[in-house]
Amino acid sequence: MNSHDIDDQLEADVYSNLPSRNDSSTGRRNRNSCRSKHSETEQRRRSKINERFQSLMDIIPQNQNDQKRDKASFLLEVIEYIHFLQEKVHMYEDSHQMWYQSPTKLIPWRNSHGSVAEENDHPQIVKSFSSNDKVAASSGFLLDTYNSVNPDIDSAVSTKIPEHSPVSAVSSYLRTEPSLQFVQHDFWQPKTSCGTINCFTNELLTSDEKTSASLSTVCSQRVLNTLTEALKSSGVNMSETMISVQLSLRKREDREYSVAAFASEDNGNSIADEEGDSPTETRSFCNDIDHSQKRIRR
């Protein structure tokens, strides 16, 4: 090989190693595609951030004149608004701390052997919850309902309600006092115009278990309705609350009281002569009382 052939070969190799136009265009396309992908990712990221900021701006109240704000100042406003909401929550919890008090701190239940003025103090047990007047009023009605029944009521109130609610505190206190005694109602007081005899309470209640069961059912339903209304008025969600009330009536053997009894026809005539009434009116009056007593005995 001569020197001329060697030079031609070297020149051909140099030209073959030089980049062509097609190669340069392909490289440009690759660089442009990488840049476009990067810009699309960045654009999606920025759009998500802007959407989140816009949702925050919609939640937090702002002035209409303050439409243009930088993100740092807006984030500071978000933090301040969160602190404001926390203060509100703390104020609400402080005002309702009485639901968390233990039942032992309540006023003890008074005995029913006192005067009527002492009986009026019963609603104070629930009135200690001073922030909820509706519950206090409804609990006073519950006590009036209990006092309308003469025999002892062994109440077992089983509730499934949220913790720290006002009714849970009252029901737990009632469970700690199972042997509550109530005032004898005026309906059971004797009528002096027909004479009186002393008898025990077990003479009023018959041995028929159906009668006592029906009376217990009526009283339980009445207390349950009142308790449900009290819960609704106090704001308790009844769809998440399950309440059951069961009252059991029992006879009493430790106390006597007077019950109106029959008077003889001669006694009726003497009473009629003293009061200026006819014997027929006196007998009819005694018969009415006897009829009412028979209805009670049933």
Swiss-Prot record:
Transmembrane segments: none annotated. Gene3D superfamilies: Helix-loop-helix DNA-binding domain. The keyword Nucleus applies. Residues 37-46, 288-298 have a biased composition (Basic and acidic residues). GO terms for biological process: DNA-templated transcription; regulation of DNA-templated transcription. Keywords: DNA-binding, Nucleus, Transcription, Transcription regulation. It comes from the Eukaryota. InterPro entries: bHLH_dom, BIM1/2/3, HLH_DNA-bd_sf. It is found in: Nucleus. Residues 33-85 form the bHLH domain. SMART domains: HLH. GO terms for cellular component: nucleus. Residues 17-27 have a biased composition (Polar residues). Residues 1-46, 263-298 are annotated as: Disordered. GO terms for molecular function: DNA binding; DNA-binding transcription factor activity; protein dimerization activity. Positive brassinosteroid-signaling protein. PANTHER family: BES1-INTERACTING MYC-LIKE PROTEIN (PTHR46412), TRANSCRIPTION FACTOR BIM3 (PTHR46412:SF9). Homodimer. Interacts with the N-terminus of BZR2/BES1. This is Transcription factor BIM3. It comes from Arabidopsis thaliana (Mouse-ear cress).
